[in-house]
Amino acid sequence: MHRQQEVLSVFEIAGITCRVECREEAFWDLLTPRYGEFASDAVPELSLRVEVTDHPPEEVVAHWSGPFARMAGTDGVLSIEGAGFRGIFDERTGEGWLSQPCDRSPFETFLTAIYAGRLLREGGFFLHAAGIMAGNGAHVFF
């Protein structure tokens, strides 16, 4: 296991510890700047295995209709599907997988849905914010 994967294999966000498994160094290179400071030694509550695939052909992306990702949930199982990616997370076991190109967006979209569901079920809340950096400072919108 290379150093970046060791640092990022388990991280904690919003009080929920997640283990991410992926063999592709390029994927870890994408995640390190964003998640490196959240590394944790705690026992993971969730586990997500990521398989990096080739980017979909342009015609697949061009013919994809609808939102970036389609989410569905049935009997404690959350699924995601988009142009060139798909995955499943079983809330009962706390385990899932995601097959996607080397890109943060599918991973982060799926992780956000998993965390949102978990937080809402456990009495937490989910707050979305956006920020803009300008010449006169930073502005955060909730």
PLM features: what roles do these ranges have?
Residues M1-A138, F142:
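A noncatalytic interaction/capping subdomain that flanks phosphate/NTP-handling catalytic cores
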